[in-house]
Amino acid sequence: MMKGVSYASNTGYKSDEYNKLVNEAKAMPEQNESWKKFAEAEKLMLEDAYIAPLIQSGMAYMQKEYVSDMFKFPTVPWSYKWADVDKEKKQLNLISTSDIPTIDPSKATDTVSFEVMTNTMEGLVRIDKENKAIPGIAESWETSEDGLTWTFKLRKDAKWSNGDEVTAKDFEYSWKRTLNPETASQYGFIMHDIVGAKEYNLGENKDPDSVGVKAIDDYTLEVKLVRPVTYFDKLMAFGVYLPQNQKFVESQGDTFGTTAKSTLYNGPFTLSEWKIEDHYSMTKNPTYWDNSAVKLDEINTKIVKDANSALNLYETDAIDRVGVTSENVDKYKDSKEFKTMKDSSTYFLQINAGNPQK
């Protein structure tokens, strides 16, 4: 579904009708009704716009049979909290085609960064193997009858890797830092359903206190929305909504999130080593509140840009998972280790027509 995409219209007026349908969809209190309205908008776009759908993507990969409980979903990065390997050394070996651009939740935009943050940090909730939102830093949460106010109750045993407690203030600070126009976060828009967030993010209102996220006390976070968002609890697992320790972030300045030591962690693992364009390692976090559920001691990731080199590493048992490119699918598709997965990305061609640049 291409929600919120603008387009050049063949007829010159249907783009307004499309935008009207999208705005109506966003205002629907029931998710099923919202999807129906989005479907109407999508149908109108495909019939009227200079847009041609191309592909809906997926992925194929190989994974060793001794690896278990390592999973991801289309909108969630690989999660290793519950992962295990059936061998004496509890170590997972992986590759990545690129290095980590940043581990600053306010500035990350890519899958590598989000994967590292998902496993070294924790938000209000975590997504489990059944794609359900389960307690993370929040022990429980509730919504108001009109669906516009969410209240999260935080656990009292969550700590940062420097020993500080993780509090509701860490979430309020983090979200407002992301929305601050000076941060220039590319993902600030994802918070626009929060009262005052859009106006603050776009610089139309310079008062951060106008944003509807507030630490009522150290262990209670209140969020006010402009419309009911039925999936808001799941959204809390997304990397942009992770907490940040204000004192630490400000002490690091521009180096925050750029090295293993210039970042704090509150998740199942810590980033223990990071050698740029070579490798990085995550180690089990002894201060994580649910440390007993973490089975792996270490996750090592080597930067390997060539797909065939990566496959060679897999075949020689140097790594435990590897992506399979389309030209190699036939070679491996009958293997017990071959797996496929749907992706949430849809690619389309948008032609610059009807509105020439001046």
Positions of the model-derived regions?
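N-terminal lobe/hinge region of extracytoplasmic solute-binding protein
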Residues: 61-62, 95-145, 264
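Gly/Pro-rich hinge or "lid" segments in bacterial periplasmic/extracellular proteins
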Residues: 108-111, 129-132, 208-210, 218, ...
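Long beta-strand-rich cores associated with HINT superfamily self-processing modules
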Residues: 2-5, 61-91
